[in-house]
Curated annotation (Swiss-Prot):
Belongs to the ATP-dependent AMP-binding enzyme family. This is Probable CoA ligase CCL13. GO terms for cellular component: cytosol. InterPro entries: AMP-bd_C, AMP-bd_C_sf, AMP-dep_synth/lig_dom, ANL_N_sf. The keyword Cell division does not apply. Keywords: ATP-binding, Cytoplasm, Ligase, Nucleotide-binding. Residues 353-429 are annotated as: SBD2. ATP binds at residues 216-224, 352-357, 449, 461-464, 556. The lineage of its organism: Eukaryota, Viridiplantae, Streptophyta, Embryophyta, Tracheophyta.
Length: 573
Protein backbone atom coordinates (compact mmCIF):
# COMPACT_ATOMS: atom_id res chain seq x y z
CA UNK A 1 0.00 0.00 0.00
CA UNK A 2 1.51 3.29 -1.12
CA UNK A 3 0.43 5.16 2.02
CA UNK A 4 2.51 2.83 4.19
CA UNK A 5 5.48 2.80 1.86
CA UNK A 6 5.75 6.53 2.49
CA UNK A 7 6.29 5.83 6.16
CA UNK A 8 9.83 4.74 5.30
CA UNK A 9 10.68 7.88 3.33
CA UNK A 10 12.90 10.18 5.42
CA UNK A 11 11.03 13.40 6.22
CA UNK A 12 12.53 16.47 7.90
CA UNK A 13 10.06 16.64 10.78
CA UNK A 14 12.19 18.28 13.45
CA UNK A 15 13.01 21.96 13.51
CA UNK A 16 16.04 21.44 15.75
CA UNK A 17 19.17 20.36 13.88
CA UNK A 18 20.49 16.89 14.77
CA UNK A 19 23.82 16.75 16.58
CA UNK A 20 26.90 16.53 14.37
CA UNK A 21 28.13 12.96 13.88
CA UNK A 22 31.16 11.96 15.94
CA UNK A 23 34.50 12.12 14.15
CA UNK A 24 34.96 8.42 14.83
CA UNK A 25 32.24 5.79 14.58
CA UNK A 26 32.19 2.01 14.48
CA UNK A 27 32.11 2.16 10.67
CA UNK A 28 35.58 3.70 10.64
CA UNK A 29 36.98 1.05 13.00
CA UNK A 30 38.86 -1.58 11.03
CA UNK A 31 37.41 -5.09 11.01
CA UNK A 32 33.80 -4.23 11.96
CA UNK A 33 30.77 -4.94 9.80
CA UNK A 34 27.00 -4.88 10.13
CA UNK A 35 25.35 -7.92 8.58
CA UNK A 36 22.66 -10.52 9.18
CA UNK A 37 24.87 -12.23 11.74
CA UNK A 38 24.77 -9.29 14.13
CA UNK A 39 21.78 -7.22 13.02
CA UNK A 40 18.23 -8.61 12.83
CA UNK A 41 15.16 -6.33 12.76
CA UNK A 42 13.46 -6.31 16.17
CA UNK A 43 9.89 -7.65 16.26
CA UNK A 44 7.68 -8.93 19.11
CA UNK A 45 6.74 -11.88 16.87
CA UNK A 46 9.90 -13.55 18.18
CA UNK A 47 8.54 -13.55 21.75
CA UNK A 48 5.86 -16.10 20.83
CA UNK A 49 8.31 -18.27 18.92
CA UNK A 50 10.59 -18.49 21.95
CA UNK A 51 7.78 -19.07 24.46
CA UNK A 52 6.42 -21.94 22.36
CA UNK A 53 9.68 -23.75 23.12
CA UNK A 54 10.79 -22.38 26.49
CA UNK A 55 7.32 -22.57 28.07
CA UNK A 56 5.78 -25.11 25.71
CA UNK A 57 3.36 -26.75 28.15
CA UNK A 58 2.76 -23.73 30.37
CA UNK A 59 -0.71 -22.18 30.23
CA UNK A 60 -0.69 -19.21 27.87
CA UNK A 61 -4.33 -18.15 27.98
CA UNK A 62 -7.56 -18.84 29.87
CA UNK A 63 -11.05 -17.68 28.91
CA UNK A 64 -13.87 -19.39 30.78
CA UNK A 65 -13.53 -23.09 29.93
CA UNK A 66 -11.05 -22.36 27.11
CA UNK A 67 -7.41 -23.00 27.98
CA UNK A 68 -4.30 -23.04 25.76
CA UNK A 69 -0.60 -23.69 26.24
CA UNK A 70 2.13 -21.58 24.64
CA UNK A 71 2.78 -24.34 22.10
CA UNK A 72 -0.91 -24.34 21.15
CA UNK A 73 -1.07 -20.55 20.91
CA UNK A 74 1.96 -20.53 18.60
CA UNK A 75 0.41 -23.32 16.50
CA UNK A 76 -2.90 -21.44 16.18
CA UNK A 77 -1.20 -18.16 15.24
CA UNK A 78 0.84 -19.84 12.50
CA UNK A 79 -2.29 -21.43 11.02
CA UNK A 80 -4.17 -18.15 11.16
CA UNK A 81 -1.30 -16.25 9.50
CA UNK A 82 -1.27 -18.92 6.79
CA UNK A 83 -5.01 -18.52 6.20
CA UNK A 84 -4.71 -14.73 6.05
CA UNK A 85 -2.26 -15.02 3.16
CA UNK A 86 -3.70 -17.97 1.23
CA UNK A 87 -7.43 -17.40 1.79
CA UNK A 88 -7.56 -13.60 1.77
CA UNK A 89 -4.37 -12.66 -0.04
CA UNK A 90 -3.06 -10.45 2.75
CA UNK A 91 0.23 -8.91 1.63
CA UNK A 92 2.87 -6.95 3.55
CA UNK A 93 1.45 -3.54 4.43
CA UNK A 94 -2.22 -4.59 4.26
CA UNK A 95 -4.40 -3.53 7.19
CA UNK A 96 -6.44 -6.06 9.17
CA UNK A 97 -8.99 -4.59 11.58
CA UNK A 98 -10.65 -6.07 14.66
CA UNK A 99 -13.88 -5.08 16.40
CA UNK A 100 -14.15 -6.99 19.65
CA UNK A 101 -13.61 -7.01 23.39
CA UNK A 102 -10.86 -9.00 25.14
CA UNK A 103 -11.28 -12.55 23.88
CA UNK A 104 -8.57 -15.12 22.95
CA UNK A 105 -8.88 -14.50 19.22
CA UNK A 106 -7.90 -10.84 19.63
CA UNK A 107 -4.82 -11.91 21.57
CA UNK A 108 -3.88 -14.32 18.77
CA UNK A 109 -4.38 -11.69 16.08
CA UNK A 110 -1.71 -9.54 17.75
CA UNK A 111 0.75 -12.17 16.51
CA UNK A 112 -0.92 -13.71 13.46
CA UNK A 113 -1.46 -10.44 11.58
CA UNK A 114 2.18 -9.26 11.76
CA UNK A 115 3.31 -12.85 11.06
CA UNK A 116 1.46 -12.51 7.75
CA UNK A 117 3.13 -9.15 7.13
CA UNK A 118 -0.07 -7.25 7.87
CA UNK A 119 -0.75 -4.23 10.05
CA UNK A 120 -3.18 -4.74 12.93
CA UNK A 121 -5.85 -2.09 13.54
CA UNK A 122 -7.83 -2.74 16.74
CA UNK A 123 -11.02 -0.66 16.73
CA UNK A 124 -12.73 0.44 19.93
CA UNK A 125 -15.53 -2.03 20.65
CA UNK A 126 -17.72 0.82 21.93
CA UNK A 127 -17.66 2.73 18.66
CA UNK A 128 -20.94 3.18 16.83
CA UNK A 129 -21.42 2.19 13.20
CA UNK A 130 -20.69 5.69 11.88
CA UNK A 131 -17.32 5.83 13.66
CA UNK A 132 -16.41 2.26 12.65
CA UNK A 133 -17.24 3.13 9.04
CA UNK A 134 -15.06 6.26 9.17
CA UNK A 135 -12.08 4.43 10.66
CA UNK A 136 -12.33 1.50 8.24
CA UNK A 137 -12.31 3.92 5.32
CA UNK A 138 -9.39 5.88 6.74
CA UNK A 139 -7.28 2.79 7.55
CA UNK A 140 -8.13 1.09 4.23
CA UNK A 141 -8.63 -2.20 6.06
CA UNK A 142 -8.98 -5.29 3.85
CA UNK A 143 -10.42 -7.51 6.59
CA UNK A 144 -12.34 -6.96 9.80
CA UNK A 145 -12.69 -9.61 12.51
CA UNK A 146 -15.91 -9.11 14.49
CA UNK A 147 -17.30 -10.84 17.56
CA UNK A 148 -20.99 -11.86 17.24
CA UNK A 149 -22.26 -9.42 19.89
CA UNK A 150 -21.02 -6.54 17.71
CA UNK A 151 -22.13 -7.96 14.36
CA UNK A 152 -25.07 -5.61 13.83
CA UNK A 153 -22.91 -2.53 14.41
CA UNK A 154 -20.28 -3.89 12.02
CA UNK A 155 -22.89 -4.69 9.35
CA UNK A 156 -24.26 -1.16 9.58
CA UNK A 157 -20.72 0.23 9.23
CA UNK A 158 -20.10 -1.82 6.08
CA UNK A 159 -23.43 -0.66 4.65
CA UNK A 160 -22.38 2.96 5.19
CA UNK A 161 -19.16 2.29 3.27
CA UNK A 162 -21.09 0.71 0.39
CA UNK A 163 -23.40 3.75 0.25
CA UNK A 164 -20.31 5.92 -0.28
CA UNK A 165 -19.00 3.61 -3.04
CA UNK A 166 -16.10 2.54 -0.82
CA UNK A 167 -15.21 -1.13 -1.05
CA UNK A 168 -15.89 -2.58 2.42
CA UNK A 169 -13.47 -4.99 4.08
CA UNK A 170 -14.29 -8.69 4.18
CA UNK A 171 -15.98 -9.58 7.48
CA UNK A 172 -14.81 -12.59 9.50
CA UNK A 173 -16.83 -13.77 12.50
CA UNK A 174 -14.98 -14.58 15.71
CA UNK A 175 -17.08 -17.61 16.64
CA UNK A 176 -17.41 -21.36 16.45
CA UNK A 177 -21.08 -21.21 17.43
CA UNK A 178 -23.41 -23.54 15.54
CA UNK A 179 -25.98 -20.74 15.25
CA UNK A 180 -23.72 -18.95 12.78
CA UNK A 181 -22.75 -21.91 10.60
CA UNK A 182 -25.24 -21.00 7.89
CA UNK A 183 -24.20 -17.35 7.73
CA UNK A 184 -22.51 -15.92 4.64
CA UNK A 185 -19.46 -14.80 6.60
CA UNK A 186 -16.10 -16.49 6.98
CA UNK A 187 -15.49 -17.92 10.45
CA UNK A 188 -12.34 -17.64 12.51
CA UNK A 189 -12.28 -21.34 13.37
CA UNK A 190 -12.77 -22.30 9.73
CA UNK A 191 -9.68 -20.28 8.88
CA UNK A 192 -7.71 -22.10 11.57
CA UNK A 193 -8.88 -25.45 10.25
CA UNK A 194 -7.69 -24.58 6.74
CA UNK A 195 -4.41 -22.93 7.71
CA UNK A 196 -0.98 -24.56 7.78
CA UNK A 197 1.41 -24.57 10.72
CA UNK A 198 4.28 -24.90 8.22
CA UNK A 199 3.71 -21.27 7.29
CA UNK A 200 6.88 -19.26 6.79
CA UNK A 201 6.60 -16.08 8.84
CA UNK A 202 6.90 -12.84 6.89
CA UNK A 203 9.33 -10.99 9.08
CA UNK A 204 9.78 -7.23 8.79
CA UNK A 205 12.60 -6.19 6.47
CA UNK A 206 12.99 -3.06 8.57
CA UNK A 207 12.28 -2.93 12.30
CA UNK A 208 10.63 0.46 11.74
CA UNK A 209 7.97 -1.19 9.55
CA UNK A 210 4.45 -0.59 10.94
CA UNK A 211 3.01 -3.32 13.16
CA UNK A 212 -0.24 -1.63 14.18
CA UNK A 213 -2.52 1.38 13.93
CA UNK A 214 -4.16 2.71 17.09
CA UNK A 215 -6.81 5.40 16.91
CA UNK A 216 -6.64 7.82 19.81
CA UNK A 217 -9.17 7.16 22.53
CA UNK A 218 -11.85 9.68 21.71
CA UNK A 219 -11.45 12.22 24.51
CA UNK A 220 -11.34 14.63 21.58
CA UNK A 221 -13.95 14.57 18.87
CA UNK A 222 -11.63 13.48 16.04
CA UNK A 223 -9.42 10.44 16.70
CA UNK A 224 -6.01 10.28 15.00
CA UNK A 225 -4.36 7.19 13.54
CA UNK A 226 -1.18 6.51 15.53
CA UNK A 227 1.26 4.12 13.84
CA UNK A 228 3.42 1.76 15.93
CA UNK A 229 6.57 0.07 14.62
CA UNK A 230 7.89 -3.45 15.24
CA UNK A 231 10.87 -1.85 17.01
CA UNK A 232 8.76 0.34 19.30
CA UNK A 233 6.41 -2.52 20.18
CA UNK A 234 9.35 -4.84 20.93
CA UNK A 235 11.09 -2.35 23.21
CA UNK A 236 8.00 -1.15 25.07
CA UNK A 237 6.75 -4.71 25.61
CA UNK A 238 9.97 -5.73 27.35
CA UNK A 239 10.20 -2.51 29.36
CA UNK A 240 6.59 -2.71 30.53
CA UNK A 241 6.71 -6.28 31.83
CA UNK A 242 10.07 -5.68 33.52
CA UNK A 243 8.85 -2.55 35.31
CA UNK A 244 5.62 -4.34 36.24
CA UNK A 245 7.65 -7.17 37.77
CA UNK A 246 6.19 -9.90 35.54
CA UNK A 247 7.82 -13.28 35.05
CA UNK A 248 7.02 -16.84 33.99
CA UNK A 249 4.81 -17.48 37.04
CA UNK A 250 2.83 -14.26 36.63
CA UNK A 251 -0.89 -14.34 35.84
CA UNK A 252 -2.11 -11.26 33.97
CA UNK A 253 -5.80 -10.27 34.01
CA UNK A 254 -6.99 -8.51 30.86
CA UNK A 255 -8.83 -5.52 32.32
CA UNK A 256 -7.11 -3.08 29.91
CA UNK A 257 -8.79 -3.27 26.47
CA UNK A 258 -6.51 -4.77 23.83
CA UNK A 259 -7.98 -2.23 21.42
CA UNK A 260 -6.37 0.57 23.47
CA UNK A 261 -2.64 1.06 22.72
CA UNK A 262 -2.55 -2.66 21.91
CA UNK A 263 -3.32 -3.29 25.57
CA UNK A 264 -0.30 -1.19 26.67
CA UNK A 265 1.84 -3.71 24.70
CA UNK A 266 1.05 -6.50 27.20
CA UNK A 267 -0.08 -9.07 24.56
CA UNK A 268 3.51 -9.16 23.34
CA UNK A 269 5.07 -8.58 26.77
CA UNK A 270 3.23 -11.49 28.39
CA UNK A 271 4.52 -13.75 25.61
CA UNK A 272 8.07 -12.51 26.18
CA UNK A 273 7.92 -13.70 29.79
CA UNK A 274 5.74 -16.76 29.25
CA UNK A 275 3.12 -15.41 31.66
CA UNK A 276 -0.51 -16.59 31.73
CA UNK A 277 -3.23 -14.37 30.22
CA UNK A 278 -6.73 -14.35 31.73
CA UNK A 279 -9.27 -12.86 29.31
CA UNK A 280 -12.52 -11.22 30.44
CA UNK A 281 -15.04 -9.37 28.26
CA UNK A 282 -16.50 -7.11 30.94
CA UNK A 283 -14.50 -5.37 33.67
CA UNK A 284 -16.12 -5.02 37.09
CA UNK A 285 -14.91 -5.21 40.71
CA UNK A 286 -16.59 -8.61 41.02
CA UNK A 287 -14.84 -9.95 37.91
CA UNK A 288 -11.49 -8.70 39.18
CA UNK A 289 -11.86 -10.19 42.66
CA UNK A 290 -13.31 -13.46 41.32
CA UNK A 291 -10.33 -13.95 39.00
CA UNK A 292 -7.82 -13.07 41.70
CA UNK A 293 -9.21 -15.93 43.78
CA UNK A 294 -10.00 -18.39 40.95
CA UNK A 295 -6.89 -17.99 38.78
CA UNK A 296 -4.49 -16.47 41.33
CA UNK A 297 -4.11 -13.29 39.26
CA UNK A 298 -0.88 -11.47 40.16
CA UNK A 299 -1.01 -8.48 37.78
CA UNK A 300 -3.52 -6.30 35.99
CA UNK A 301 -3.80 -2.79 34.58
CA UNK A 302 -6.59 -0.27 34.94
CA UNK A 303 -7.46 3.41 34.68
CA UNK A 304 -7.90 5.30 37.99
CA UNK A 305 -11.67 5.22 37.46
CA UNK A 306 -11.56 1.41 37.67
CA UNK A 307 -9.51 1.63 40.88
CA UNK A 308 -12.14 4.02 42.18
CA UNK A 309 -14.83 1.44 41.38
CA UNK A 310 -12.85 -1.21 43.27
CA UNK A 311 -12.34 0.81 46.45
CA UNK A 312 -16.01 1.84 46.54
CA UNK A 313 -17.41 -1.61 45.75
CA UNK A 314 -19.06 -3.88 48.34
CA UNK A 315 -16.98 -6.66 46.75
CA UNK A 316 -13.89 -5.12 48.31
CA UNK A 317 -15.13 -5.80 51.82
CA UNK A 318 -15.98 -9.40 50.92
CA UNK A 319 -12.66 -10.28 49.28
CA UNK A 320 -10.03 -8.37 51.25
CA UNK A 321 -7.48 -8.81 52.58
CA UNK A 322 -6.28 -10.39 49.33
CA UNK A 323 -4.93 -13.97 49.43
CA UNK A 324 -1.67 -12.82 47.79
CA UNK A 325 0.03 -9.68 46.51
CA UNK A 326 -1.51 -8.22 43.36
CA UNK A 327 0.37 -5.62 41.30
CA UNK A 328 -1.79 -2.99 39.62
CA UNK A 329 -0.49 -0.72 36.87
CA UNK A 330 -2.64 2.39 36.61
CA UNK A 331 -2.58 5.26 34.14
CA UNK A 332 -4.77 7.31 31.86
CA UNK A 333 -5.31 10.24 34.22
CA UNK A 334 -3.73 11.33 37.52
CA UNK A 335 -5.02 8.97 40.25
CA UNK A 336 -6.32 10.66 43.41
CA UNK A 337 -3.92 9.93 46.33
CA UNK A 338 -6.91 8.83 48.41
CA UNK A 339 -7.71 6.07 45.90
CA UNK A 340 -4.09 4.81 45.87
CA UNK A 341 -4.11 4.74 49.68
CA UNK A 342 -7.31 2.68 49.85
CA UNK A 343 -6.09 0.25 47.15
CA UNK A 344 -2.92 -0.45 49.12
CA UNK A 345 -4.91 -0.87 52.34
CA UNK A 346 -6.84 -3.61 50.52
CA UNK A 347 -3.61 -5.40 49.60
CA UNK A 348 -2.93 -4.12 46.08
CA UNK A 349 0.47 -2.72 45.12
CA UNK A 350 -0.14 0.26 42.84
CA UNK A 351 2.38 1.05 40.10
CA UNK A 352 1.55 4.47 38.64
CA UNK A 353 2.49 5.04 35.01
CA UNK A 354 1.77 7.77 32.49
CA UNK A 355 1.76 7.70 28.73
CA UNK A 356 -0.23 8.33 25.61
CA UNK A 357 -1.35 6.41 22.55
CA UNK A 358 1.54 8.18 20.81
CA UNK A 359 4.11 6.57 23.15
CA UNK A 360 2.94 2.94 22.76
CA UNK A 361 1.13 3.44 26.09
CA UNK A 362 3.34 3.58 29.22
CA UNK A 363 6.12 6.18 28.98
CA UNK A 364 6.83 7.00 32.64
CA UNK A 365 6.90 5.09 35.89
CA UNK A 366 6.59 6.46 39.42
CA UNK A 367 9.40 4.50 41.08
CA UNK A 368 8.59 4.25 44.79
CA UNK A 369 11.48 4.96 47.15
CA UNK A 370 12.02 3.14 50.48
CA UNK A 371 12.24 6.41 52.42
CA UNK A 372 8.67 7.25 51.44
CA UNK A 373 7.45 4.51 53.78
CA UNK A 374 8.42 6.65 56.79
CA UNK A 375 6.30 9.59 55.64
CA UNK A 376 2.79 10.40 56.80
CA UNK A 377 0.17 8.66 54.61
CA UNK A 378 -1.10 11.87 53.02
CA UNK A 379 2.41 12.89 51.92
CA UNK A 380 3.39 9.36 50.87
CA UNK A 381 0.41 8.82 48.59
CA UNK A 382 0.72 12.30 47.10
CA UNK A 383 4.25 11.33 46.02
CA UNK A 384 2.98 8.05 44.55
CA UNK A 385 0.38 9.96 42.53
CA UNK A 386 3.09 11.78 40.57
CA UNK A 387 3.90 10.60 37.05
CA UNK A 388 7.54 9.91 37.94
CA UNK A 389 10.54 9.17 35.74
CA UNK A 390 10.97 8.12 32.14
CA UNK A 391 10.00 4.54 31.36
CA UNK A 392 12.74 1.97 30.84
CA UNK A 393 12.47 2.10 27.03
CA UNK A 394 11.96 5.87 26.77
CA UNK A 395 15.35 7.54 26.36
CA UNK A 396 14.41 11.09 27.36
CA UNK A 397 11.60 12.90 29.14
CA UNK A 398 11.48 16.54 30.12
CA UNK A 399 9.23 19.43 31.05
CA UNK A 400 10.02 22.32 28.70
CA UNK A 401 8.87 25.78 27.78
CA UNK A 402 6.93 25.06 24.54
CA UNK A 403 8.17 28.29 22.92
CA UNK A 404 11.84 28.54 23.93
CA UNK A 405 12.22 24.74 24.29
CA UNK A 406 14.29 25.35 27.44
CA UNK A 407 13.89 22.97 30.39
CA UNK A 408 11.85 24.45 33.22
CA UNK A 409 13.33 24.77 36.68
CA UNK A 410 13.10 21.65 38.83
CA UNK A 411 11.25 23.51 41.58
CA UNK A 412 7.88 21.76 41.52
CA UNK A 413 6.06 24.98 40.58
CA UNK A 414 7.27 26.18 37.16
CA UNK A 415 4.86 24.80 34.57
CA UNK A 416 5.90 23.63 31.12
CA UNK A 417 4.86 21.05 28.54
CA UNK A 418 5.75 17.39 29.08
CA UNK A 419 7.84 16.11 26.17
CA UNK A 420 9.39 12.79 25.16
CA UNK A 421 12.16 11.62 22.88
CA UNK A 422 12.90 7.96 22.28
CA UNK A 423 12.40 4.72 20.37
CA UNK A 424 8.91 4.12 21.76
CA UNK A 425 7.46 7.34 20.38
CA UNK A 426 5.07 6.68 17.48
CA UNK A 427 6.16 6.69 13.85
CA UNK A 428 3.56 9.39 13.18
CA UNK A 429 -0.11 10.01 12.41
CA UNK A 430 -1.20 8.04 9.33
CA UNK A 431 -2.32 10.34 6.48
CA UNK A 432 -1.73 13.47 8.59
CA UNK A 433 1.78 14.76 7.99
CA UNK A 434 0.87 18.24 9.29
CA UNK A 435 -0.17 16.83 12.67
CA UNK A 436 2.96 14.66 12.77
CA UNK A 437 5.21 17.66 12.09
CA UNK A 438 3.45 19.70 14.77
CA UNK A 439 3.77 16.90 17.31
CA UNK A 440 7.53 16.52 16.62
CA UNK A 441 8.36 20.23 16.29
CA UNK A 442 11.66 21.04 17.98
CA UNK A 443 12.90 17.47 17.94
CA UNK A 444 10.67 16.27 20.80
CA UNK A 445 7.22 14.71 20.94
CA UNK A 446 4.93 17.35 22.42
CA UNK A 447 2.25 15.72 24.59
CA UNK A 448 -0.01 18.72 25.12
CA UNK A 449 0.11 17.93 28.84
CA UNK A 450 1.24 20.59 31.30
CA UNK A 451 3.37 19.61 34.26
CA UNK A 452 6.15 20.50 36.67
CA UNK A 453 9.51 18.95 37.42
CA UNK A 454 10.51 18.29 41.03
CA UNK A 455 13.95 18.44 42.59
CA UNK A 456 14.27 14.65 42.46
CA UNK A 457 13.62 14.68 38.69
CA UNK A 458 10.08 13.28 38.99
CA UNK A 459 7.46 15.01 36.86
CA UNK A 460 3.91 15.75 37.92
CA UNK A 461 1.03 16.56 35.60
CA UNK A 462 -0.98 19.68 36.27
CA UNK A 463 -3.39 19.63 33.35
CA UNK A 464 -3.98 19.25 29.66
CA UNK A 465 -3.30 22.50 27.81
CA UNK A 466 -6.85 22.50 26.56
CA UNK A 467 -8.31 21.79 30.02
CA UNK A 468 -6.76 24.66 32.01
CA UNK A 469 -9.38 27.10 33.31
CA UNK A 470 -8.31 30.74 33.00
CA UNK A 471 -10.25 32.72 35.58
CA UNK A 472 -9.52 36.43 35.97
CA UNK A 473 -6.16 35.91 34.27
CA UNK A 474 -5.15 33.12 36.69
CA UNK A 475 -4.53 29.56 35.48
CA UNK A 476 -6.55 26.99 37.40
CA UNK A 477 -5.30 23.39 37.32
CA UNK A 478 -8.37 21.20 37.03
CA UNK A 479 -6.31 18.25 38.31
CA UNK A 480 -5.64 20.05 41.60
CA UNK A 481 -9.31 20.92 42.03
CA UNK A 482 -10.34 17.34 41.22
CA UNK A 483 -7.88 15.99 43.80
CA UNK A 484 -9.60 18.08 46.48
CA UNK A 485 -13.04 16.97 45.30
CA UNK A 486 -12.02 13.30 45.51
CA UNK A 487 -11.01 13.82 49.14
CA UNK A 488 -14.65 14.58 50.05
CA UNK A 489 -16.25 11.54 51.67
CA UNK A 490 -19.35 11.73 49.46
CA UNK A 491 -17.62 12.11 46.08
CA UNK A 492 -17.30 9.02 43.89
CA UNK A 493 -16.09 10.75 40.70
CA UNK A 494 -15.34 14.32 39.71
CA UNK A 495 -14.30 16.33 36.67
CA UNK A 496 -13.71 20.07 36.41
CA UNK A 497 -14.08 22.12 33.21
CA UNK A 498 -14.37 25.78 32.27
CA UNK A 499 -17.71 27.58 32.30
CA UNK A 500 -17.77 30.86 30.35
CA UNK A 501 -18.12 33.98 32.49
CA UNK A 502 -18.67 37.61 31.39
CA UNK A 503 -16.74 39.00 34.36
CA UNK A 504 -13.94 36.47 34.91
CA UNK A 505 -13.65 35.00 31.42
CA UNK A 506 -14.05 31.47 32.80
CA UNK A 507 -14.88 29.90 36.14
CA UNK A 508 -14.36 26.30 37.34
CA UNK A 509 -17.42 24.09 36.92
CA UNK A 510 -17.40 20.72 38.70
CA UNK A 511 -19.35 17.69 37.51
CA UNK A 512 -19.70 15.25 40.39
CA UNK A 513 -21.04 11.73 40.89
CA UNK A 514 -21.90 10.98 44.50
CA UNK A 515 -21.39 7.69 46.29
CA UNK A 516 -24.38 5.51 47.01
CA UNK A 517 -26.17 6.73 50.12
CA UNK A 518 -25.19 10.38 49.69
CA UNK A 519 -27.57 11.21 46.83
CA UNK A 520 -29.75 13.55 48.85
CA UNK A 521 -27.39 14.44 51.66
CA UNK A 522 -24.90 16.74 49.93
CA UNK A 523 -25.59 20.06 48.22
CA UNK A 524 -23.63 22.04 45.65
CA UNK A 525 -23.01 24.76 48.22
CA UNK A 526 -21.46 22.23 50.61
CA UNK A 527 -19.11 20.97 47.89
CA UNK A 528 -18.11 24.53 46.97
CA UNK A 529 -17.43 25.42 50.63
CA UNK A 530 -15.38 22.23 51.06
CA UNK A 531 -13.17 23.31 48.15
CA UNK A 532 -12.90 26.95 49.27
CA UNK A 533 -11.64 25.75 52.65
CA UNK A 534 -8.79 23.88 50.94
CA UNK A 535 -7.96 25.95 47.85
CA UNK A 536 -7.44 29.59 46.89
CA UNK A 537 -10.95 30.92 46.32
CA UNK A 538 -10.41 31.59 42.59
CA UNK A 539 -9.64 27.86 42.14
CA UNK A 540 -12.75 26.60 43.90
CA UNK A 541 -15.70 25.58 41.68
CA UNK A 542 -18.38 28.22 41.27
CA UNK A 543 -20.78 25.65 39.83
CA UNK A 544 -21.41 22.02 40.83
CA UNK A 545 -23.50 19.64 38.73
CA UNK A 546 -24.44 16.21 40.07
CA UNK A 547 -24.64 13.54 37.35
CA UNK A 548 -22.98 10.41 35.99
CA UNK A 549 -19.81 11.23 34.07
CA UNK A 550 -19.31 10.17 30.42
CA UNK A 551 -16.26 7.96 29.85
CA UNK A 552 -14.25 6.32 27.09
CA UNK A 553 -13.89 2.54 26.91
CA UNK A 554 -10.67 2.79 28.95
CA UNK A 555 -12.33 4.74 31.76
CA UNK A 556 -11.08 8.22 30.87
CA UNK A 557 -13.64 10.93 31.53
CA UNK A 558 -14.74 12.61 28.30
CA UNK A 559 -14.24 16.23 29.25
CA UNK A 560 -15.14 17.55 25.82
CA UNK A 561 -18.74 16.45 26.44
CA UNK A 562 -18.76 18.18 29.84
CA UNK A 563 -17.25 21.33 28.30
CA UNK A 564 -20.15 21.52 25.87
CA UNK A 565 -22.59 21.20 28.77
CA UNK A 566 -20.81 23.93 30.74
CA UNK A 567 -20.73 26.17 27.68
CA UNK A 568 -24.47 25.71 27.19
CA UNK A 569 -25.06 26.93 30.77
CA UNK A 570 -23.85 30.40 29.79
CA UNK A 571 -22.23 32.96 32.06
CA UNK A 572 -22.60 32.73 35.83
CA UNK A 573 -22.01 36.49 36.26
Amino acid sequence: MDNYRRLHTPVALCVASPPAPPTTSWKSMEGLVQCSANHVPLSPITFLERSSKAYRDNTSLVYGSVRYTWAQTHHRCLKLASALTTHFGISPGDVVATFSYNIPEIYELHFAVPMAGGILCTLNARNDSAMVSTLLAHSEAKLIFVEPQLLETARAALDLLAQKDIKPPTLVLLTDSESFTSSSYDHYNHLLANGSDDFEIRRPKNECDPISINYTSGTTARPKAVVYSHRGAYLNSIATVLLHGMGTRSVYLWSVPMFHCNGWCFPWGAAAQGATNICIRKVSPKAIFDNIHLHKVTHFGAAPTVLNMIVNSPEGNLHTPLPHKVEVMTGGSPPPPKVIARMEEMGFQVNHIYGLTETHGPATNCVCKPEWDALQPEERYALKARQGLNHLAMEEMDVRDPVSMESVRADGTTIGEVMFRGNTVMSGYFKDLKATEEAFEGGWFRTGDLGVKHEDGYIQLKDRKKDVVISGGENVSTVEVETVLYSHEAVLEAAVVARPDKLWGETPCAFVTLKEGFDNGVSADQIIKFCRDRLPHYMAPKTVVFEELPKTSTGKIQKYILKEKAKAMGSLS
